[in-house]
Amino acid sequence: MALRDAIATPEGKQTYVRRLFATIADRYDLITVLLSYGQDRRWKQRLVAMASPRQGMRAVDLATGTGDIAFSLAEAGASVVGVDVTHRMIELANAKARHLSGGPFFLVGDMIALPLAGDSFDLVTAGYGLRNVPDLRAAIDEIHRVLHAGGTMLSLDFNRPESPILRAVYLAYLNVTGAVLGWLLHRDPDTYRYIPASIRNYPGAAGVARMLEAQGFDRVEYTPVLLGLMAIHIARKKS
């Protein structure tokens, strides 16, 4: 089945994404560096700085992967839960956490059906998460549900540039680079071609901002990163 067809429905995308991230988990940290032009850690630190974590803040990091954002929030004094749908990602995050005291607590969970109580967090973060869910509105609803009134959400993700020329060049670059890395690391050129395919179906930064507003957030803003190839969204749950 062609990649485009495999992710054409919510059910198909959910199955494909779960299988994909289980496959790439052990190389996830490496691939995020390679596909972000070496800027991944800088972008995540920028998101963390915008979140203004503090002692006693309750935070949840969604699509936590191996825990980069979660660990940074915890270092600033926040009480952090890291959630990821991929069991292997959580195993890797927990392996890192064993060397720390007072670090995040990690658990397996789905962004569209979080195993967390409502109105229980001051902050929700997501790195490369919203673009991968099978139902974006459901994920935004879950973020809204678990936040306290007045709580903040931040999301870092790939963006679909508004310029048709830049968009075409960007997607072509990701497609070729993804194919090469997929073959070198997994002997499967389609492994990282999922990224440009998912961007084509993503509403883009402005579209995500409109969805956040429609689902009950205010003070919605987004910051273009790297000429708009990436974006960081910030929004507040209405008081």
What are these regions (language model features)?
Residues 112-123:
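A short acidic, Gly/Pro-enriched loop at the edge of an enzyme's catalytic core
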Residues 28, 124-125:
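Hydrophobic beta-strand segment of the Class I
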Residues 137-152:
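A short glycine-rich, Lys/Arg-flanked "PGG" loop and its adjoining helix->strand segment in the class I
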Residues 1-19:
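N-terminal auxiliary segments of SAM/dcSAM-dependent transferases
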Residues 58-113:
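Class I SAM-dependent methyltransferase SAM/SAH-binding core
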Residues 27-30, 36-57:
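Conserved alpha-helix/loop element of class I SAM-dependent methyltransferases that forms part
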Residues 209, 216-239:
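Core SAM-dependent methyltransferase catalytic element
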Residues 16, 156-211, 215, 221:
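C-terminal alpha-helical "lid/dimerization" subdomain adjacent to the S-adenosyl-L-methionine
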